[in-house]
Amino acid sequence: LEQLLKFLNVTLDTLMLPCHFCSSFMDLNNKASYLASQLKVIVKDCCFKGACIKCRRKLAFAERQKYQVCVGEADLVEAMVGSHVINLTVRCSECLALLTASEKLDAKCELQTFILVRHMWRTSCRAC
């Protein structure tokens, strides 16, 4: 999204970005949340599209239901992967936001559950 804004030479508040799933136009808060989540903008029907928070939450839930492989705490994840959780790509299990290094460490210290969904680890972010 950040590259798209630069390419189009527009600001986040002026970009008209519909949700890929529900087709409603995303408001500034939704676009800011989408930008922070570092999810990709897609092109469909010659139109750039994102995903509103409501649809991202529904998608995250549906993917957990359908594609969940295993569940465990950070120590299990590190043993399985052979790397510290800070080095892994981890998304929020609720809103699909990309977790920061500090959020991953907090999740480990708080013994939060990590869920393997579609070959990617997920746990809750600070906002959720």
Could you say what each language-model-derived stretch is?
Residues 1-128:
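N-terminal pre-domain and mature-chain start segments
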